[in-house]
């Protein structure tokens, strides 16, 4: 999987998973599966376009995380990107822009907490206020 933490005006984007899907109702950073012909970066650019209608270029690679859920395992390539405009933003699911301090108000999949820890380890505190 490839996931991107998207920042806009010091806030980050969370999208709520559909209730009828696995981990339904939880909030997460946008992203998705990597197709067999794609690089991790190409996948995250495609997924962000599909999920948000935002066209991002040159997302910064942060690293990989692994997480074992009860019935499946994920390996996630994490990227981050600051955007200057959200005029083209179109999201079908519920979404919100929040500060990292506001994240505790939302139920996130466990893997998302590992992503936040990875961002902190990579000196991204300027985004994690």
PLM regions: where:
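Short aromatic/basic micro-patch
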Residues: 28, 73, 96-97
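Nucleotide phosphate-binding site architecture
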Residues: 13, 35, 104
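NUDIX/MutT-family hydrolases
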Residues: 78-82, 87-122
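Active-site segment of metal-dependent pyrophosphate-handling enzymes
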Residues: 2, 49-86
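The catalytic Nudix box helix
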Residues: 29-63
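N-terminal strand-loop-strand
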Residues: 1-28, 83
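Short loop/turn microsegments at loop-to-beta-strand junctions
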Residues: 1-2, 39, 93
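Helical scaffold of the NTase/Pol beta-like nucleotidyltransferase catalytic core
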Residues: 123-129
């Amino acid at each position: 999987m490839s996931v991107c933490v998207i920042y806009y005006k010091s806030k980050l984007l969370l999208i709520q998973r559909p209730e009828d899907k696995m981990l339904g109702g939880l909030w997460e950073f946008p992203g998705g599966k990597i197709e067999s012909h794609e690089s991790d970066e190409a996948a995250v650019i495609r997924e962000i376009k599909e999920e948000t209608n935002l066209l991002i270029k040159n997302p910064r690679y942060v690293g990989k995380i692994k997480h074992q859920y009860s019935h499946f395992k994920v390996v996630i390539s994490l990227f981050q990107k600051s955007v200057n405009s959200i005029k083209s933003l179109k999201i079908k699911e519920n979404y919100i822009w929040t500060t990292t301090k506001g994240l505790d108000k939302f139920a996130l999949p466990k893997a998302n907490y590992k992503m936040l820890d990875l961002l902190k380890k990579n000196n991204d505190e300027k985004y994690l206020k």
